């Protein structure tokens, strides 16, 4: 709701909307996500569609993992944490989520945390952060719509076998 209100306020302030007409999120285009208006446009355009995809993904993952009372997820390139929001819709209410979101952009809008969850956002380079970790301890590692923004060598660095990522989590 805040996003729509904020964007409407921006639009009615007399700005040149032609600037946003040039913003594209497809075909390898990387818009300036640090611009709050690009964030608003992106979220208004894609948040619900992506959350539906993530809900399906997490539902499938949870069926395979059967996490019990807690699940730990690290989201690499989490943006506004839409994938966390989707995860909260799939796990039982009694299940606690330990969510670690990493993104190079400090998004102005983030999904609201449930009271029982342990949520931490890190505004950092994911490749650097993960490669410095001695051991990866989450149950699942997610690349929500961000995997195409990483080079092959970045992916290899993140997924080093010595970090002991379980096969169900990749």
Mark where each language-model region is.
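A short SAM/SAH-binding and catalytic strip from SAM-dependent methyltransferases
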Residues: 138-154
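Conserved class I S-adenosyl-L-methionine
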Residues: 69-79
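Conserved SAM-binding motif I beta-strand of class I
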Residues: 98-103
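Class I SAM-dependent methyltransferase Rossmann-like catalytic core
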Residues: 27-65
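N-terminal auxiliary segments of SAM/dcSAM-dependent transferases
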Residues: 1-24
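Conserved beta-strand signature within the Rossmann-like core of class I S-adenosyl-L-methionine
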Residues: 166-170
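S-adenosyl-L-methionine
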Residues: 110-135
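Conserved SAM-binding loop of SAM-dependent methyltransferases across substrates and taxa
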Residues: 80-94
């Amino acid at each position: 709701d805040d996003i729509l209100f904020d964007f409407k306020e921006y639009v009615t302030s007399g700005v040149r909307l032609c600037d946003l007409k040039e913003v594209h999120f497809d075909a390898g285009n990387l818009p300036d996500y640090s611009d709050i208006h690009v964030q608003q446009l992106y979220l208004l355009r894609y948040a619900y569609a992506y959350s539906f995809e993530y809900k399906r993904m997490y539902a499938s993952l949870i069926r395979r993992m059967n996490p019990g009372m807690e699940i730990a997820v690290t989201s690499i390139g989490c943006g506004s944490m839409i994938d966390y929001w989707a995860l909260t819709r799939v796990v039982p209410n009694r299940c606690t989520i330990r969510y670690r979101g990493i993104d190079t952009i400090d998004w102005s809008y983030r999904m609201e945390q449930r009271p029982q969850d342990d949520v931490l956002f890190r505004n950092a380079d994911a490749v650097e952060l993960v490669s410095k970790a001695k051991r990866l301890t989450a149950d699942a590692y997610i690349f929500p719509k961000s995997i195409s923004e990483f080079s092959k060598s970045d992916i290899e660095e993140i997924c080093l076998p010595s970090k002991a990522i379980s096969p169900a989590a990749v």
